[in-house]
């Protein structure tokens, strides 16, 4: 039981890490009109970029 829990945690960590590593690539696709003033890797920055990508 404990082993499967550890495995699950590792899997989630890997998925999260790979998604996070893809962020800079996403950054370059964001139109320049989205001048998000929050740091790109902070929550407000992420929300701002999401809104912008949605075209709002």
From Swiss-Prot:
Compartment list: Secreted
Residues with Alanine amide modification: 54
Tissue: Expressed by the venom gland.
Keywords per UniProt: Amidation, Disulfide bond, Ion channel impairing toxin, Potassium channel impairing toxin, Secreted, Signal, Toxin, Voltage-gated potassium channel impairing toxin
Residues spanning the signal sequence: 1-21
Record note on modification: Contains 2 disulfide bonds.
Pro-piece positions: 22-31
GO molecular function terms attached to this record: potassium channel regulator activity; toxin activity
GO cellular component terms, A-Z: extracellular region
TM regions (residue ranges): none
Function, in words: Toxin with weak activity on calcium-activated potassium (KCa) channels. Causes a small reversible block of human KCa2.1/KCNN1/SK1 and KCa2.2/KCNN2/SK2 (IC(50)=25.1 uM) currents.
Other information: Negative results: does not show activity against Kv1.1/KCNA1, Kv1.2/KCNA2, and Kv1.3/KCNA3. Does not elicit any spontaneous pain behaviors after intraplantar injection in mice.
Record-given protein name: Xylotoxin(2)-Xa2a
């Amino acid at each position: 039981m404990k082993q499967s829990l550890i495995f699950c945690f590792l899997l989630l960590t890997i998925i999260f890490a790979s998604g996070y590593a893809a962020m800079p690539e996403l950054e370059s696709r964001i139109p320049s009109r989205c001048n998000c003033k929050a740091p790109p890797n902070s929550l407000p920055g992420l929300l701002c970029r999401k809104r912008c990508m949605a075209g709002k």
